[in-house]
Regions:
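Conserved glycine-rich cofactor-binding loop
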Residues: 33, 40-41
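Conserved glycine-rich Rossmann-like NAD(P)H-binding loop of the short-chain dehydrogenase/reductase
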Residues: 54-70
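Amphipathic alpha-helical dimer-interface segment in Rossmann-like NAD(P)H-dependent oxidoreductases
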Residues: 133-147
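A glycine-rich helix->loop->beta "capping" turn
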Residues: 76-79, 98-111, 117-122
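N-terminal Rossmann-fold NAD(P) dinucleotide-binding loop
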Residues: 44-45
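Non-catalytic terminal and boundary segments that flank Rossmann-like NAD(P)-dependent oxidoreductase
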Residues: 1-35, 97
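The beta1-alpha1 cofactor-binding region of Rossmann-like NAD(H)/NADP(H)-dependent oxidoreductases
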Residues: 65, 81-97
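Short alpha-helical oligomerization interface
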Residues: 117-133
């Protein structure tokens, strides 16, 4: 198989370096429920702001509730922030089960949380930290949320 070595721009109506609000411009997500991991810092908080700006009900799991509540003050209510630590699978399962009971439908899942270039460490279950948090934790969350 040959892969083209020349890229051609496509007209999406979105600039090459869009703001989060530009990406959701024109959308109406009223009545939709979104889950954003890592939603209390960096790209995650901008994602939460963009989704709420077009009507979505956004839930943010966090391993540091106080930090998340402070960061998201004025963006989403504190009761839409739940305790979850992606490095601890029972915590992930507990959050997923609580979410599933509280919200019968999940319309949007954005798995944004992650760690990078961290020193060698292990999760509660003995997995390498980066693999456990970035991949296995999110996979476990998805499995818990699926019917």
């Amino acid at each position: 198989m040959r892969i083209s070595d020349h890229q051609h721009p496509i007209d999406t109506g979105v600039s090459s370096k869009p703001e989060a609000t530009e990406v959701v411009s024109g959308l109406d997500l009223s009545g939709k429920t979104a889950l954003v991991t890592g939603g209390y810092s960096g790209i995650g908080i901008e994602t939460v702001k963009a989704l709420t700006s077009v009507g979505a009900h956004v839930v943010v799991p966090s391993r540091d509730i106080d930090r998340a509540v402070q960061a998201l003050d004025g963006v989403i209510p504190a009761d839409q922030i739940g305790a979850m630590d992606l490095s601890d699978l029972p915590s992930v399962t507990a959050f997923g089960e609580t979410f599933a009971r509280a919200y019968r439908v999940l319309d949007i899942a954005i798995f944004n949380a992650g760690v990078m270039a961290c020193p060698l460490d292990r999760t509660q279950q003995g997995l390498e930290w980066q693999l456990g948090v970035n991949h296995v934790g999110h996979f476990a969350l998805l499995r818990t949320l699926l019917p």
